[in-house]
Amino acid sequence: MTEFTPYFFDFSHLDYRNFVVLRFHGYSKRKICKMYKLAYFCILRVCEQAQKNDYRFTYKDYVYLKSYDVTNEFICKMYRIDLLDLEFFEVMNR
C-alpha cells in the first residue's frame, strides 16, 4: 500500500469519487468501512449504484480524480468506461 493520507472534508458520507481514490491508493473495502464507520453492505451499495450507471461520470469527477493522481486506466476500470471514450471525453471538455 502506498503512503497516502486522505484529506477529504466529509468523513460522514462516502461518495463514489472518494471510494475510487481510496481504492486506487490501496485501501481495502474493509479499511474504508472502518474509516467511514460504515457497514460493509454500504460499500457494496455504492459500488452497485455505479455499476447500474446511477452515478454519472462528469468532467468535475475527472478533474477531482486526477488531482489525486488516479490513472486513466484505473478510472476506466472503476467506472467501466473504454479508454478511448475517456480520452475523447477529456479532449471535448478542455
Features from the language model and the residues they span:
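DNA-contacting interfaces and partner/effector-binding or oligomerization modules
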Residues: T2-Y7
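Short, amphipathic alpha-helical "recognition" segments used to contact nucleic acids or chromatin
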Residues: F9-Y27, D54-V70, F88-E90
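Broad hydrophobic/π-residue packing in well-ordered secondary structure
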Residues: R23, K29, C42-C47, K66, ...
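General helical structural elements
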Residues: Y27, C33-K34, Q49, V70
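Short alpha-helical "recognition helix" segments of helix-turn-helix
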Residues: I32-C33, I75-C76
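Short, solvent-exposed alpha-helical "recognition" segments
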Residues: F41-D61, L84-R94
